A protein has these predicted regions:
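Long, contiguous binding/interaction regions
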Residues: 1-131
Length: 131
């Protein structure tokens, strides 16, 4: 069961062939965050057209509360994009591996760059910034 106020991240991936679809979803999320069925989406990061952090291909990050999980998943699936969705806890490794939900084909992440357990810096950035 998901806690309605629990923080989540979605990493929405794209490649050259589906960048325009990713851009359309990005624009929609950015324009509608904090309103309607996206009221619990609080941050949409920049589209990063290169590998960054543990992510091997371009992506952008969406921050939201658990209440928005069904809506966020529905939007990603409807656009046929690949994504990694996870709770935001103090265990960055588990968040990105054993506790993660993949939509589409999983990608090999660079786990060596994740924060040590108990020191997840993404918690302080939640709702404010991505990398």
């Amino acid at each position: 069961m998901t806690d309605a106020n629990e923080p989540f991240h979605a990493h929405i991936y794209y490649e050259a062939f589906d960048r325009s679809t990713a851009q359309q979803l990005h624009s929609e999320l950015q324009a509608k965050k904090g309103t309607g069925d996206l009221v619990d989406v609080i941050f949409v990061g920049v589209m990063t057209d290169r590998a960054v952090g543990p992510h091997p291909i371009p992506q952008y990050e969406v921050h939201f509360y658990g209440k928005a999980l069904p809506t966020v998943l529905e939007r990603i699936k409807a656009n046929r994009l690949r994504a990694l969705v996870h709770r935001l806890t103090n265990d960055d490794l588990a968040d990105h591996t054993s506790q993660a939900l993949w939509i589409g084909e999983p990608l090999p992440l660079d786990l060596s760059v994740l924060d040590p357990a108990g020191m997840n810096q993404a918690i302080a950035r939640f709702g404010n910034s991505d990398f």
